[in-house]
């Protein structure tokens, strides 16, 4: 079973990622972004793997602009918080420039959630045996 971050947890990691506590400009969009990974369609998970769920969260946080500032940084942090809760962690050898370009491509609507889910594992360290798929 997957674990999901709370809105408060996301805002806490966002504060570290941004250097300030982001202001939620649109609470409805923020809540919608937070809930997207848990969506179901006809009783089945709309985003079946943890990578799909993290991609859906990252995509929503970056593209909906629910925050006054820091949407991209918060999206990246929230994505890795969700993945971390499920046993996946950012690689210690993270290519920061590649990660930045990845998030910028999401913000420019060049990547959909499916493409994001395919690419996220390249930013992760090798999977622990206890990690959720």
Regions found by a protein language model. Give the residues of each.
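FIC/Doc superfamily catalytic core
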Residues: 1-133
């Amino acid at each position: 079973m997957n674990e999901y971050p709370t809105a408060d947890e996301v805002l806490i990691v966002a504060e570290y990622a941004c250097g300030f506590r982001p202001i939620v400009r649109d609470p409805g969009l923020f809540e919608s972004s937070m809930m997207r990974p848990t969506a179901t369609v006809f009783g089945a998970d709309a985003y079946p793997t943890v990578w799909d769920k993290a991609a859906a969260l990252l995509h929503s946080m970056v593209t909906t602009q629910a925050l006054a500032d820091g949407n991209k940084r918060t999206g990246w942090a929230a994505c890795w918080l969700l993945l971390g809760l499920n046993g996946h962690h950012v690689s210690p050898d993270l290519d920061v420039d590649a990660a930045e370009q990845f998030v910028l491509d999401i913000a420019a609507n060049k990547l959909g959630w499916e493409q994001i889910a395919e690419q996220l594992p390249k930013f992760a360290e090798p999977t622990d045996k206890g990690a959720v798929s």
